[in-house]
Amino acid sequence: MSCPVIELTQQLIRRPSLSPDDAGCQALMIERLRAIGFTVERMDFGDTQNFWAWRGQGETLAFAGHTDVVPAGDADRWINPPFEPTIRDGMLFGRGAADMKGSLAAMVVAAERFVAQHPNHKNRLAFLITSDEEASAKNGTVRVVETLMERHERLDYCLVGEPSSTEVVGDVVKNGRRGSLTCNLTIHGVQGHVAYPHLADNPVHRAAPMLNELVNIEWDKGNEFFPPTSMQIANLQAGTGSNNVIPGDFSVQFNFRFSTELTDEMIKSRVVALLEKYELRYSVDWWLSGQPFLTQRGKLVDAVVNAIAHYNEIKPQLLTTGGTSDGRFIARMGAQVVELGPVNATIHKINECVNAADLQLLARMYQRIMEQLVA
């Protein structure tokens, strides 16, 4: 299939960029962007490669994404080697095809076509690309955003190429994301022999009533834009592995995906109050992965909806469901942020794939968004 979007996607897939290793993907993108007049600034931090590229000046539309991918898993279970892109029955297979090398290729080709038609565009077009989104995400987009904010860089609109679609490209646009807060809690007891419980203090038994109340809390009812806040226990750990030892400590890890009805401080206060209510001895460590954000109808959402309607003749759902993305960092700059990308049915799975025609369509949509906001 001779198509610049498909060809570039295949070139990117061939580079096994397991997070945070970029494996040469960004060099490929940078070469293409410099060729059409972009200024490129590398912003590497630690083991992570990032770049910020721009063309023009004024009101700024940035396209954001990541070159890293998750591990392929058992390569023998793939219909073809995961880093050897193959097209079968119109589907392009390979790790990263949907998440998100197809989007990156569509962005670059859209920019090439846009610049060819609008060499003197009135506003600024930019790219923010990282190699660490799938892993720790500590030296990636968040560090670039901090640098841009320190020098008061302008960012008005940002389109993140995450695979937002569910059945056909453009059927879902993410115009916000829930916040993510993780609690690492340890309940302290006294270790002892199970035959002499009066000489010990079992932290699992102590914690059980508190955990029962915790999992039954209705945190909020959500709102027009967000589903209700969710709390899920992710990991439990206690004991020595022996059946005759009462554990001394009991570790519980739980995560909140929270709406704009709550703040992280409100959640923390309620959890601590619960621990105090049950008179537990504990230590606690919190990790805030991201605050909730929302982009309401405005120039960016309107441009995205227009592009989808023009090329796919559908009206997208505007949703805030799903996991976190780097959009949570970019929103700190005050930018309108949305996510539009290919169908996400196979992301992170064996035999990850994307409809090749969808990537061609996505490039056209991206180009039309550029035309509405940058030309």
Curated annotation (Swiss-Prot):
Origin superkingdom: Bacteria
Self-association state and partner proteins as the record states: Homodimer.
Binding locations of Zn(2+) 1: H66, D99, E162
Sequence positions that bind Zn(2+) 2: D99, E134, H348
Catalytic activity entry: N-succinyl-(2S,6S)-2,6-diaminopimelate + H2O = (2S,6S)-2,6-diaminopimelate + succinate
Hydrolase as UniProt keyword: yes
Protein name: Succinyl-diaminopimelate desuccinylase
Biological process, per Gene Ontology: diaminopimelate biosynthetic process; L-arginine biosynthetic process; lysine biosynthetic process via diaminopimelate
Keyword vocabulary terms for this entry: Amino-acid biosynthesis, Cobalt, Diaminopimelate biosynthesis, Hydrolase, Lysine biosynthesis, Metal-binding, Zinc
Record-stated family: Belongs to the peptidase M20A family. DapE subfamily.
Top enzyme class: hydrolase
Pathway terms, separated by semicolons: Amino-acid biosynthesis; L-lysine biosynthesis via DAP pathway; LL-2,6-diaminopimelate from (S)-tetrahydrodipicolinate (succinylase route): step 3/3
Record-listed E.C. numbers: 3.5.1.18
Gene Ontology MF term list: acetylornithine deacetylase activity; cobalt ion binding; succinyl-diaminopimelate desuccinylase activity; zinc ion binding
Pfam families: M20_dimer (PF07687), Peptidase_M20 (PF01546)
